[in-house]
Design a protein with these regions (language model features):
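Substrate-binding/active-site clefts of carbohydrate-active enzymes
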Residues: 1-131, 139-156, 164-167
Length: 167
């Protein structure tokens, strides 16, 4: 099964700075990026804008999605977990598991400044380098909340990612 999370729509993101090569006909090094840019240019030449569907509420790193079905001891350390697990993910109070409040799996810790910068850098990359015109955010409210104690809350006074990216 080459579909992370067992789906075909690829909402289990691994690479926030690269097109999914499964959807590219050119599998060579740099091929998917080249094809994506060519696709965006073709749409623009036809008078259409390109909006990217982005998923920042969770990632595709396995081992944390299905509770007892997953073995946390053998969870993949392919990306953010291997860099700094407690910075990128919202951990339970005992740090033995992951918060899961969306039905999608491991919540990214979007109120952490490092994670916010990561998200903003990714959004800027897709506009500046890849030429997209805008975004559709999967579960957008998740990136606008912060953790206070053991609860996730929406603070009207907090400066969220959604506030930062408004242009």
């Amino acid at each position: 099964d080459d579909n992370p999370g067992g789906n075909y729509w690829a909402y289990m993101t691994y690479g926030y700075f690269a097109p999914d090569r499964r959807y590219s006909s050119d599998k060579s090094y740099g091929g998917p990026t080249k094809e994506f840019k060519e696709m965006v240019a073709a749409f623009h030449n036809a008078g259409m804008e390109v909006y990217l569907d982005v998923v920042f509420n969770h990632s595709g790193e396995g081992g944390t999605w299905y509770g007892e079905k997953d073995n946390y001891n053998t969870a993949e350390l392919t990306f953010m977990r291997g860099l700094d697990n407690s910075t990128y993910y919202s951990l339970t109070k005992d740090a033995a598991g992951y918060w899961e409040t969306t039905g999608c799996g491991n919540n990214l810790q979007c109120d952490n400044p490092t994670v916010r910068n990561f998200i903003i850098d990714s959004l800027a990359y897709w506009i500046d380098e890849m030429g997209v015109d805008g975004y559709r955010f999967d579960l957008a409210p998740v990136i606008g909340r912060e953790k206070v104690g053991n609860e996730w809350v929406y603070s009207k006074s907090a400066k969220t990612i959604l506030d930062i990216i408004k242009l």
